[in-house]
Amino acid sequence: ADEMRNVSDEEAKEFHAMFSQAFTVYVGVAVVAHILAWAWRPWIPGDEGFG
């Protein structure tokens, strides 16, 4: 598979760092959105149900 490599290790590490940061931000936004949605309208009922 070495003939398929067209990026250097340094480029791969740079891409990985950018990808990891973007993924972390994406997950963080999703978590905040879920917390806000839960505060607005919980999707798992309590003991008394949704009533």
From Swiss-Prot:
Keywords: Antenna complex, Bacteriochlorophyll, Cell inner membrane, Cell membrane, Chlorophyll, Chromophore, Light-harvesting polypeptide, Magnesium, Membrane, Metal-binding, Transmembrane, Transmembrane helix
UniProt record, GO biological process: photosynthesis, light reaction
Described purpose of this protein according to its UniProt entry: Antenna complexes are light-harvesting systems, which transfer the excitation energy to the reaction centers.
Annotated protein name in UniProt: Light-harvesting protein B800/850/890 beta-2 chain
Record-annotated membrane-spanning stretches: 18-40
Membrane topology (Cytoplasmic): 1-17
Record's bilayer topology term: Single-pass type II membrane protein
InterPro entries tied to this protein: Antenna_a/b, Antenna_beta_CS, Antenna_beta_dom_sf, LHB-1/5, Light-harvesting_complex
GO MF annotation list: bacteriochlorophyll binding; electron transporter, transferring electrons within the cyclic electron transport pathway of photosynthesis activity; metal ion binding
Family designation: Belongs to the antenna complex beta subunit family.
Record's keyword annotation contains Ribonucleoprotein: no
Superkingdom: Bacteria
Source organism: Halorhodospira halophila (strain DSM 244 / SL1) (Ectothiorhodospira halophila (strain DSM 244 / SL1))
SUPFAM superfamilies found in the cross-reference section: Light-harvesting complex subunits
Periplasmic-side segments: 41-51
Record's subunit section: The core complex is formed by different alpha and beta chains, binding bacteriochlorophyll molecules, and arranged most probably in tetrameric structures disposed around the reaction center. The non-pigmented gamma chains may constitute additional components.
GO cellular component: plasma membrane; plasma membrane light-harvesting complex
